Amino acid sequence: MPEQAQQGEQSVKRRRVTRACDECRKKKVKCDGQQPCIHCTVYSYECTYKKPTKRTQNSGNSGVLTLGNVTTGPSSSTVVAAAASNPNKLLSNIKTERAILPGASTIPASNNPSKPRKYKTKSTRLQSKIDRYKQIFDEVFPQLPDIDNLDIPVFLQIFHNFKRDSQSFLDDTVKEYTLIVNDSSSPIQPVLSSNSKNSTPDEFLPNMKSDSNSASSNREQDSVDTYSNIPVGREIKIILPPKAIALQFVKSTWEHCCVLLRFYHRPSFIRQLDELYETDPNNYTSKQMQFLPLCYAAIAVGALFSKSIVSNDSSREKFLQDEGYKYFIAARKLIDITNARDLNSIQAILMLIIFLQCSARLSTCYTYIGVAMRSALRAGFHRKLSPNSGFSPIEIEMRKRLFYTIYKLDVYINAMLGLPRSISPDDFDQTLPLDLSDENITEVAYLPENQHSVLSSTGISNEHTKLFLILNEIISELYPIKKTSNIISHETVTSLELKLRNWLDSLPKELIPNAENIDPEYERANRLLHLSFLHVQIILYRPFIHYLSRNMNAENVDPLCYRRARNSIAVARTVIKLAKEMVSNNLLTGSYWYACYTIFYSVAGLLFYIHEAQLPDKDSAREYYDILKDAETGRSVLIQLKDSSMAASRTYNLLNQIFEKLNSKTIQLTALHSSPSNESAFLVTNNSSALKPHLGDSLQPPVFFSSQDTKNSFSLAKSEESTNDYAMANYLNNTPISENPLNEAQQQDQVSQGTTNMSNERDPNNFLSIDIRLDNNGQSNILDATDDVFIRNDGDIPTNSAFDFSSSKSNASNNSNPDTINNNYNNVSGKNNNNNNITNNSNNNHNNNNNDNNNNNNNNNNNNNNNNNSGNSSNNNNNNNNNKNNNDFGIKIDNNSPSYEGFPQLQIPLSQDNLNIEDKEEMSPNIEIKNEQNMTDSNDILGVFDQLDAQLFGKYLPLNYPSE
């Protein structure tokens, strides 16, 4: 036991330092022998070991291996980099050094064997290097055999074949390792070169890369264990960029990234930045050291937003990204996020959050937002200060700005991830910041008289804050984590729509969406705020999008729900149009992560419509192709953005997977509806029963809507101040959602006269009324119930929407061709549901009508065998067209089959090997759709969009699908 205790005491003793660095030797102070040493770290000296020791200078024995002649071995980062960039070299090094090792002998430490030296032998150093190479090789290629049993030529040949795919992963690994580990062993050295202040951006960018590569040096480490003992928390050595470059990056942060997030005071920031550059780094005060991480973080974000989506200089773009990561790590190492109390520290955390968002690192971003929120709450930023609080005007306004910025980021990131918000509006009473420019807020007073009613950047941020307060309500009302029921009240949604309407009407003229002649100073803010508004609308209408599914039973569909589902598609199309405009005007880059998300979900929503659409007439087909074109436009926008940021790239890759999974269905639908003028294309199935409501049936509310809520929604829909009067989707659009079924000449006449009494000419029994809104340009926005549903035009017989049961009743009783369809939806209480199947007046009333449908589909619609109407193929086409035109959705709902999250399973006919697609005008080729493929495709579609919900709204949010 005493011997073990003595050995333990010896093991914890500090290792004797064999050599001090040049600076410590010069100043004759204790050195810890590290690279860099603690003394050089504290005083920002350059830590070198260049000067030879006196022992080396005086020694005449060339056989002694002294420290002055020790060759620096490779650091771990160097070895990892070598493994990733050139595995040939890694393998050859291991083989070569193992070949040398057996013949290596110990170098004599002295001519006198009685005084052995304790220096390393060449054999030991080689073994250490081999062990380190082998450790990395085993980690990079864990499934390969031992290096001695590896056929290196074969392996290298295979590696080169797959190099393109594997290189990206290895490069990313090396890059991340270099940023986190290698830089952490270097000290902070914010030293300005003699010509830094006069450097220009063009002169600086080419040279900065080489400076950063040579910023740190490495010493030989005895072994992997010795290397792991190096302090990881050591700060990073970074040379501040020239002032011109720093100002350029900071300006990019303010004017591109933080347009809607205002949490800084520009004059104060510039003043502290000037002091930083004018002060010797050795003489930095504690206040300047507190400002340094904020400066680094602002530069890091500015580097990301300096990347251009149109630049062809890949090396410059990669350099900017690397610079962003470098300064981000510098800021992160300098700040203690667990003890951030001052304004500069919390601002720095906010900048780090923005950087993480733009880099698509949402998990870390979520953690940092929580830290920032707790720091702000601990500092009392959420409480309103009294006039005699003792804080200066700048401090008071900064507290407001910081709190509301953190609050907005918290609401946004939790909406993205489907997680609870950190704070409720009932928990704070802080007022919004004053709408004053920074120059009009000083340390001693406010200067509102100098504002002259000019909209400030803080005023822009305030409008964004008001919008996010509404977003918070939407999430609370429509996406509660703890639900009391599955009921969504129409009144609740209507009140949220009206709040958005009031917010929109209260915007200053510079921020009104689609306003013309906008001052260039406000153009970017206008477009970004418009995009945020559309993003809020997407979340508002998202619970209704499943009403566009062909699996929905028409008799249980609430028209107001369907209308809002259509609004979600209209909003998505507006997002695509706006994003395309912003990209073309260089107002949007891939670093706007929330913009990429909004575009992504918009395209995904359009894809859902494309694969669930019913096209009963030419107008619907024309709209279908417009939406298909918009979806492809949105995808092309993401392609332009994906190379400018990691966030955009990840978003595009996820969307591309959806495109690939749904590609087969797109091909089928495109072939089916290849021409907007094709009115006779139809799909023959044995389940083509007309899902029209029975003449005596009344509209039944969906399962998750209460009867009282439905009544309220209907009464609201009829009134002038209803939600129909306010269509958020069309409020910003200059074009209708789809073609209006009314006579075009009548529409043009009424629009030209500026009348709004079109709803008075409608059937009073129709639930939805028409609105015409004239915008500032004199253009009309026509809003109709039939804008939000599919329109069917059966020749001279006008029919209204699928939910206008009065018109359906008239159409059913006055059908001009009674031989066409004689089963007017026989689903009456007490009757067999199988009677709903169309048999085309066949005498076969058996429950299984597969034979009839087989005959209908046989020989290109020559269904004369079981059809009492012995007309020619043209009559058969007319019959099938009328069958389709009187079919609300054309798909039977099977409530007993499995479903995806409440979506009823699509019942596919099993009696036919394929489904023939006929085209009267031969505008599209005939294709065959296998039943099994169609079944699988339907499952894939619903499964993909269920995954999409999980990706975008988190697993904690309800999908709000109707339960059967």
Curated annotation (Swiss-Prot):
Coiled-coil parts of chain: none
Residue(s) carrying Phosphoserine: 166, 186, 963
Phenotype upon changing residue 707 to F: In strain: SK1
Low complexity composition-biased segments: 800-896
Source domain of life: Eukaryota
Bridged cysteine pairs (disulfide): none
Effect listed in the UniProt record for changing residue 770 to T: In strain: SK1
Entry keyword annotation includes Disulfide bond: no
Gene3D superfamilies in the cross-refs: Zn(2)-C6 fungal-type DNA-binding domain
Family: Belongs to the ASG1 family.
Protein name per the record: Activator of stress genes 1
Source organism per UniProt: Saccharomyces cerevisiae (strain ATCC 204508 / S288c) (Baker's yeast)
Lineage: Eukaryota, Fungi, Dikarya, Ascomycota, Saccharomycotina
Gene for this chain: ASG1
